[in-house]
């Protein structure tokens, strides 16, 4: 029998309370007929002042008996999206991952691209299998868009560090739906799966996006200057200046050589540092 809520599975939907029962509230699609099918919202999730006819924003999924169920808890993943999820158990037929709901998400063995270990985090995509069940997959490359439609330069987006290429940079899962690149020249200390806010720095002719963890230079320089000064004031900081290697600058400050020079220029203007005869930057005594 076809699930009347299949088109809502894995999505957040605006639903309407039609009636109450011992188990909870029965919801139907807003504007549907009085005889329309309903799905259950468990009693513990019903707002205290809820009445028939009230609208509720809920996520629709299947319970352990494959019955459609509504929840006001928003999971970490919705249909067609990709996010890093933690493996909670491994069985002979697949692995279960924590996606924020009591019923964990199954990633069948056939959809795993590597052996999974309990506690590990991997990018998982959510889709409907041929039996209409919400299922996880590790085959996420084809689910992620590479064209940045809807994004603008200098817009801030949410992302998770995905794959690292020493020559190119870090590929980032952006807004759980797209792939962006944090170029190798951008300083960072991101671990795989680490979430961060990224700024879209460039949209290439082919629609791909380049990212940065930093604000535009004119906005970032104040924070960088404060950070550079704090590092220079630490005991044991080695001499550093304009002729220092980019690697040393990045190791000490987590900044590119260009950003470091901008910060030093700002500090010189403020009189917070001075240059030695050898060209090293030295913090003024406080």
Please give the residue ranges for each predicted region:
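Single-stranded RNA-binding regions, centering on S1/OB-family and related RNA-binding modules
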Residues: 1-286
């Amino acid at each position: 029998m076809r699930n009347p809520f299949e088109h809502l599975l894995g999505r957040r939907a605006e639903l309407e309370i039609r009636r109450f029962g011992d188990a909870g509230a029965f919801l139907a699609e807003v504007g549907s007929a009085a005889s329309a099918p309903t799905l259950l919202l468990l009693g513990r999730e019903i707002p205290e002042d809820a009445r028939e006819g009230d609208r509720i924003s809920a996520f629709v999924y299947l319970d352990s008996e494959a019955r459609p169920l509504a929840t006001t808890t928003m999971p970490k993943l919705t249909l067609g999206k990709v996010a890093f999820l933690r493996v909670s158990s491994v069985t002979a037929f697949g692995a279960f991952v924590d996606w924020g709901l009591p019923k964990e998400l199954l990633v069948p063995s056939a959809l795993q691209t590597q052996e999974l270990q309990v506690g590990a985090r991997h990018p998982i995509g959510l889709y409907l299998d041929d039996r209409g069940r919400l299922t996880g997959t590790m085959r996420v490359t084809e689910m992620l868009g590479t064209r940045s439609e809807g994004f603008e330069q200098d817009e801030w987006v949410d992302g998770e560090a995905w794959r690292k290429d020493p020559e190119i940079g870090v590929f980032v899962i952006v807004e759980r739906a797209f792939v962006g690149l944090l170029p190798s020249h951008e300083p960072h200390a991101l671990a795989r799966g680490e979430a961060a806010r990224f700024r879209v720095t460039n949209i290439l002719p082919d629609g791909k996006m380049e990212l940065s963890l930093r604000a535009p230079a004119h906005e970032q320089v104040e924070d960088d200057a404060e950070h550079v000064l704090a590092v220079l004031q630490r005991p044991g900081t080695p001499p550093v200046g304009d002729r220092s290697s980019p690697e040393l600058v990045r190791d000490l400050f987590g900044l590119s050589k260009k950003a470091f020079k901008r910060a030093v220029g700002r500090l010189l203007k403020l009189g917070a540092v001075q240059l030695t005869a050898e060209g090293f930057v030295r913090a003024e005594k406080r």
